[in-house]
Amino acid sequence: MSTMNTLAFCYGLPNINDITQGIIFVRNNIFYSYLTDYAMEACILNYINIRADKIEDLKKSLVGKTISVRVIRVDVLKGYIDVSIV
């Protein structure tokens, strides 16, 4: 029965290079996207290493907006998803 749950979880993840919609939010100065099609959070790789002053500007312009993102990496075992802005 546990294998059924694991398989069901795997099928709920996006594929690499999929383009989907996400709502942008920030946690601990890291930008994330809530993938509305998959009901999961994904880290946005475009904005991992940026200066603190740029973070504030990006927060003002991006947070709360729905944008298109491309899936870059998926860790099926941990359920982690990394995306980039299209």
From Swiss-Prot:
Keywords attached to this Swiss-Prot or TrEMBL record, sorted alphabetically, are: Host-virus interaction, Inhibition of host innate immune response by virus, Inhibition of host interferon signaling pathway by virus, Inhibition of host PKR by virus, Interferon antiviral system evasion, RNA-binding, Viral immunoevasion
List the GO biological process terms. symbiont-mediated suppression of host innate immune response; symbiont-mediated suppression of host PKR/eIFalpha signaling; symbiont-mediated suppression of host type I interferon-mediated signaling pathway
The record's listing under InterPro entries reads: K3-like_poxvir, NA-bd_OB-fold
Q: Which residues form the S1 motif domain?
A: 15-86
Single GO MF descriptor: peptidase inhibitor activity
Gene3D superfamilies to which the protein is assigned, alphabetical = Nucleic acid-binding proteins
Assembly and partners are described as: Interacts with host PKR kinase.
Q: What does this protein do?
A: Viral mimic of eIF-2-alpha that acts as a pseudosubstrate for EIF2AK2/PKR kinase. Inhibits therefore eIF-2-alpha phosphorylation by host EIF2AK2/PKR kinase and prevents protein synthesis shutoff.
Please state which protein family the record places this protein in: Belongs to the poxviridae K3 protein family.
Q: What protein does this entry describe?
A: Protein K3 homolog
